[in-house]
Amino acid sequence: MDEKLAKIGGLLSDCFIHELLEDPYITDISYNGKEIFYLDNRKGRCKFKCDITNDEIYAFLRQISNLCDSSFSLSQPILDVSFLNYRLNAVYKNLCRKKGEKVLTFCLRKFNLNKIMISEKSDFTTSKILKFLGFAVKSKMSILIAGATSSGKTELQKYLINKLNNHERVVIIDTINELDIKYNENVDITCLITDLKQNIDLKDLVKLSLRFNPDYVVLAEARGAEFEDVLTSSLSGISTITTIHAKSVDTIIERAINLVQINNKNLNYETIKNTILMHFDILIYVEKVIQFDGSIKRRLTSLKFIINGEPIDLIDPNTNDLLIERIPEKIRKELVSEGL
């Protein structure tokens, strides 16, 4: 491990939130200038009892920023760094207030790099739907996953990557190291991470990935014009698994079109729509549902299979299970032969 990363690990293991960092169910920790809150996947958002001052918070953040070769001060008031299995965002006190007082704030997001959370035993979706999605990636179908923040998009990507055929070449593209976990060791996986200090962004890496001769390009999240390059790569016969933010299942296509139009405002709406529907095979929508007791459930709520440019819903609204009879006969026979 890099010496600086080792020092960060030591700092975190003995810091004021170390017990939260050690809990595998906690994914987000935030400080609003006075209180610390955390997001527990079992209990929802909770308040953490901790007596700490803004000065102590600043010392903690300053240490991390220095070890990440970044600055955090009045002149550099926004900190955005990734390290180990964390992403830290902090705001200096000249930009933030709490009851009129200048304060620091931060949000620390923690990623699970040890295991894949979705399985046929989880309540994310049914075993039939997961088996169908496993078949889809083995058949090199392109998949677009949409949902709100923290709805399970990345976890679904991890599950799908782990279902790829042996000896396939996969290039994963991300702004952080969230998807770099232990997968099937017989799949050839390369992870490319952006470096904004060197002006290397997602768009650059998508173009670079094509030179690796991949079977699949996995873009952790399309936020802007790089979505057009993913779409272009599909024209070359390269399959993709990509996520985007969308408010509902009905806005997935519109959101994807908007991303393409960022640098191409004059492109025809219907032309872009038809291109998307031609080169993606599956559209998925996932949701984060907050229960009455505050606990959180993440579920796959929509699965559409694109047939001749038309998205066909594959989830039975009554059973929430796979409508296998809507799948084209040739594919359906293959699924049945594999035990679905």
Predicted regions: what is each one?
Residues L39, K43-S139:
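P-loop NTP-binding catalytic core
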Residues Y159-L277, E287:
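Switch/coupling sub-region of P-loop NTPases
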Residues M1-C46:
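N-terminal anchoring/assembly modules that precede and organize ATP-driven motor systems
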Residues M1-L20, F292-L340:
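NTP-binding/hydrolysis catalytic cores, primarily Walker-type P-loop NTPases
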Residues K153:
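Conserved lysine of the Walker
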